[in-house]
Amino acid sequence: MNILGGEEVKGVILAAGYGSRMGEKPKGLLKIAGREILYRTIKNLEKNGIKEFIIVTNERYLQKFEEFVKENNLQNVKLAVNRFPEKGNGYSLYVAKDFVKGKFVLVMSDHIYEEKFYELALRGEGLIVDRNPKFVDIDEATKVKIENDRVVDIGKEIPSWDGVDTGFFILDDSIFSVIEDILKEKEVVELKDVVKRARLKVSYVDGLYWMDVDTPGDLKKARKLIVYSSVKGVGDGFISRYINRKISTRISALLVDHITPNKLTIVTFLFGIFSGLMNLISVPLAAILYQISSIFDGVDGEIARARMQTSKFGGFFDSILDRYVDFTYLLTLAYVTIREPIWWVIAGIAIFSSAMVSYSTERFRGAYCADAYKVVPALRKIPGKRDERIFVTMIFALLGLIKPLFALLAAWSTLRVIITIYLVWRDVNG
């Protein structure tokens, strides 16, 4: 069952335009952050219950779309050909007439939307309008004049307007009768003509990330926005939110088209091990490199989410390698700075309990098949996450306060594990 009232709703994607400003490649097949725009659209609609898709293209681009469907094993996608694309995008919609019955979703092939947009838009009806567009060029946007929640005028140059057309529609097959009426009057049918003639109902999704990709500049902008919206959020500590992510997202935007998440995880791991071994040469330099490795540690996850390549193995792999990095860094730090047996005991407790902080949340995932930070929100407010511990470690190491650092880590990490156990007992099993 999907959120459109339990109906089996299909998705229609218009991709029959030539998009001359972007060269010979169809705009929907342009890759942004490692994935085609169309792939993003299809997969996000699938997440929200849309199971079958019709892509309307033209004869020139048909082979390219056939290759796209085959390469991505999209068995739920059918291709329809508009042999007269010069008749307008309204006519392209009409080409889909024989493929849909009842309610269906209509989107443009060159539009991208954040995940939350899909969730809200699919609860609406008619044309989805944004009254607070933050990411589109208003001069180029199609504006909409609305009265009583229905479209009364639409176009780029209308004198007054209430919102912007997002290129996302929830329609039913009665729209084809409207197109047929217009075809009796003229040969070229634009979608705006259909919307205005039908006086489509309007639903609102305001202020969320969406945009259409018309120029190379739009591609660059879209890549950055996709990466910035791919930050994990839940489970991030204070340092990640206010320092690390501001740097890591910029790195991710540069790398997202060029490297896979798992390869980057390995590179980050090797850099982290290197930071630990640098303690044998320079403790201050090693501390700085350790903090840099913490920043890099967020990049693989951001790229995985931006490229739509998240996997259980990726998270599992990254978590294990993080433990090796932390163990190597703290062990080598202790090796070059500590001589007294009692402080080796304290350092051992610090190393073990630091690993247990991460293990406690990962073990929760294994036991309850859920994210501890989502099920027990109070955990988000407790300091001591990996990013916070690494940042504090850097500060103490730069100040030469190694023994106080190990004492702090031993007490801090142990206390956080105890609090985690208590909160899980209280909120989950209490």
UniProtKB/Swiss-Prot annotation:
CTP binds at L14, A15, A16, K27, E119. Pfam families: CDP-OH_P_transf (PF01066), NTP_transf_3 (PF12804). Its EC number is 2.7.7.74, 2.7.8.34. It comes from the Archaea. Mg(2+) binds at E119. It is a multi-pass membrane protein. Residues 8-230 are annotated as: MobA-like NTP transferase. GO terms for molecular function: metal ion binding; nucleotidyltransferase activity; phosphotransferase activity, for other substituted phosphate groups. In the N-terminal section; belongs to the MobA family. In the C-terminal section; belongs to the CDP-alcohol phosphatidyltransferase class-I family. Its cofactor is Mg(2+). Gene3D superfamilies: 1.20.120.1760, Spore Coat Polysaccharide Biosynthesis Protein SpsA, Chain A. Keywords: Magnesium, Membrane, Metal-binding, Multifunctional enzyme, Transferase, Transmembrane, Transmembrane helix. Involved in biosynthesis of di-myo-inositol phosphate (DIP), a widespread organic solute in microorganisms adapted to hot environments. Catalyzes the condensation of CTP and L-myo-inositol-1-phosphate into CDP-L-myo-inositol, as well as the biosynthesis of di-myo-inositol-1,3'-phosphate-1'-phosphate (DIPP) from CDP-L-myo-inositol and L-myo-inositol-1-phosphate. Its main location: membrane. This is Bifunctional IPC transferase and DIPP synthase. One of its GO terms (cellular component) is membrane. GO terms for biological process: phospholipid biosynthetic process. The chain crosses the membrane at residues 269-289, 341-361, 390-410. It comes from Pyrococcus furiosus (strain ATCC 43587 / DSM 3638 / JCM 8422 / Vc1). It is found in: Membrane. It catalyses: 1D-myo-inositol 3-phosphate + CTP + H(+) = CDP-1L-myo-inositol + diphosphate; CDP-1L-myo-inositol + 1D-myo-inositol 3-phosphate = bis(1L-myo-inositol) 3,1'-phosphate 1-phosphate + CMP + H(+). Residues 231-428 are annotated as: CDP-alcohol phosphatidyltransferases.
